[in-house]
Amino acid sequence: MSPDTTVDGLRILPTQHSVSQVLQRVESLARARGLTVFAQIDFSGDAERAGLTLRPTGLVIVGNPKAGTPVMAATPTVAIDLPLKVLAWQDAEGKTWVAYNDAEYLRARHGFPAALAKNISALDALAAAAAAQDP
């Protein structure tokens, strides 16, 4: 996978951080930006508890009802993709990646007005900041 790509509506960014570090950074940055952190899912931990093996993989669910509600009011089907999610995983080579749904992809998928895409575009800056190397 090449750095900073969009594949089938997923924005994918490389990071030097571990999966757990990325997820912690997403939570911290989301709260600092006034977003609600609804949940963090540790898929690899869940797999381990089930007696299975999965490379480090996790998801943070974040949102802002003031931003998401107008989008859902305009096009109820977008609720299947909201709240917004940030996925972090480690690949077979040990590289860590961060992915999230591109706002324009969600707009095209659900057909809500283009003016509302900005309401769900917060993940562009949030994911980039979470993936970025500290100065």
Regions from the PLM with identified roles:
Residues 85-113:
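Beta-strand/loop substructures that line and gate deep hydrophobic ligand-binding cavities in soluble
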